[in-house]
Amino acid sequence: MIELRGKAVADAHKAILQEKVAAVGDSVITMAVLLVGEDHGAHMYATFMEKTAKNFGYGFVLKQLPETATQDEVVAALKELNDDAAVHGILPLMPMPKHIDTEALIDMLDPKKDIDGLTTYNIGLVTAGKGGFAPCTAKACMAILKHYDIPVEGKHVVVIGRSQVIGKPVALMTLAAHGTVTMCHSRTPDLAEQVKRGDIV
């Protein structure tokens, strides 16, 4: 069994990203984060994203709304980011307050700015194997396999979890790479047995 560590892969990708940002020159690439409410994890992630932007030299915009923000107010904030030509990528942070219809909100996101592959449009492209933006964690899983020179073709891949941002896209991407995929989740019986059968877990 080979345990796959992500740090070496992350370090290599950081160097590549720094080169790409530097190559843009005077043009500023800007990422926007839409943060609604008081979720501690979402606030911590927004802080992390801002620090990352500073470290790499790209622009960062934080659009923050209170817990009491209405659906219309959140939609208006997203539309403003969609329409802003200076913003190149948008990441709506989850979870949002329970009264916000996040599914409806996400599909109002400009697919060209949907950097975490959340929209139905990008999910469809990934599902069809026609590109599109895939969620970053799913892309990271594929990058780790590539870094360690582990072929997916012909392998039995066991994916644990079925979330929209990790499990499902990882399953689709490994399937597109000609793996044989088994998806497991909280209601899968004999999970340990499924894991034993996998070439890649």
Show which residues each predicted segment covers:
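Helix-enriched interaction subdomains in cytosolic or periplasmic regions
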Residues: 1-9, 84, 100-107
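Short, well-structured alpha-helical segments in soluble
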Residues: 73-85
